[in-house]
């Protein structure tokens, strides 16, 4: 944010009038702009503000790409946009520029709250969007914030109410909607979904639906991805009815060109599963002067391959990245890999979407991706912005035919490569030696084996993935294991639930267990009993046992307790002849039958529940009509439609009531939290002055600086405020002043009011003497 200069009232008035006139002229240009006639090639040809143009120029963004040329004018005019383009085509700027321009033309300030919400499926992509926004928007006065998992929630809560443009992942955004008191989305202008097809799939379905329910329906929505979804259900969830498609034909149409960049050289090799690690190690050894990304299917495999290859020392720097790492480690790895020239990165699909790595030479897919969309996003890490790149995928003989057929539907036909036997090197003996010496490596190998087999088991495309054809023993030997570990396979329902829980915030899962007042009820889990606890809980079985002591104690106090609980008065005697005779079973068989519910029902029949009408006649709870009575009411299809429509109206009415009740509960929770915060602030104000922290505006610094400030705040927030201590040694000047005040007090003479002349004379004499 540029430094503000002080102006007098007249100057400020002129500046406001000038800015208002600029905004009016800009809106006129946007309405009159026709992309078919203008055919803009540069950003300066578009109807955008001077501040945005200045930021784009300083960030070296000058020429427009095809997706930017087609989508930005439509977004500036307020249309909902469904955009798709090849990887590395500049989709990030295609939605960031309309976000800045929309808020600029609306004269958005800090007091207006949240104006734009940008949702990304991964933390790394959200961080990249935040960095680009900081570069191109540093000459504007909007405040931007980044909320992702792995960061201090308290630090984000304190500042989220003053953010104009919020970028984050679905789980953390929903967590702030439930917990942050000042987070208000009622004034939202734009919703942006980057990698929209991933955000709309099953993994984020419930989270995204909950977010959208809290957003106003009058917002503008922008969807961007390299593989776009045109499902009517997905678009209806986002309230998209009248939207504009941009660039989707070349990506989704089967008769169009390939969905991958033209400068990307794609190839594949047929490799048996037990030989994959040998081929991978040999490939890395022969490409030591390259920048490589190696994709594997699970984090366990990434960890195992990284640790084993690191000990084998192929001669190139090795890095690994997966979703189970802490956020600081993931950020450092991304930064190092981006700056390195010759390096190999082992990764899962956590960086398969949207991440812009400079100058990647090779993208290697050791494991077959789950679908063609994942393949397109993986290979899209190379050949970005027209640069050259290469990709290689390893397919087993069982996967080759089916997956190549899937690729052909998108006009992707990779060329087949043959392996030179002279370049191939087996590392199985070295792996067996490493796993024999290091038990931790052996454990990682077992986990990698299990995770790969489970990943094949849960795949939906059974034409490509054949679980029953996996050579388990040979694959285990290729990892250096002495044998194939035993694996327990769960049902598909539990697998889908695990996928859903994987993308759900732990804080949200905790809040789901809260009661109506918002208090989280902690489960009383049994504590772990150690052998020392068991030792102290042992009881004596000899003369020192509890039973023996009770007996001896009772005998010792027999005399004292002689009159305790004695009958003092008898009302009457009970006559056994007057008691009613109960039906007592006469034999064991009758007793067993009386206690058996099944036998009782067999003899007496099932109980029937009836209801009585106004006339007192009994009717069964569920009365079924005869076929003749049913046909008298009309056609069966018509009755079915009437019943469904009636039930649909009832459910819609109940759904509105349920949503209103849920909304009132959320508001009540927020109100209580706000009241608690207000009381806490009032208590703090009595002890010390309140120090407000400034908002982090665009362009205030690097992303790393903003994140470091968040970490510092986290440490500071944990420290308690210490009361101000008095100085151990008093100042000498203070002592002198105290002595002077004491002397003056001693000189004061207290007398009664004089009544006579003699009293006045004595008072005068005393004053003269003193």
From Swiss-Prot:
Q: Where is the composition biased (Basic and acidic residues)?
A: 650-667
Residue ranges under compositional bias (Acidic residues)? 683-694, 732-741, 751-761
Q: Name one GO biological process term.
A: rRNA processing
Which controlled-vocabulary keywords does the entry list?
A: ATP-binding, Helicase, Hydrolase, Nucleotide-binding, Nucleus, Ribosome biogenesis, RNA-binding, rRNA processing
Location in the cell reads: Nucleus, Nucleolus
Please state the Enzyme Commission number of this protein: 3.6.4.13
Family that this chain belongs to: Belongs to the DEAD box helicase family. DDX10/DBP4 subfamily.
Name of the protein: ATP-dependent RNA helicase DBP4
Name the species this protein comes from: Kluyveromyces lactis (strain ATCC 8585 / CBS 2359 / DSM 70799 / NBRC 1267 / NRRL Y-1140 / WM37) (Yeast)
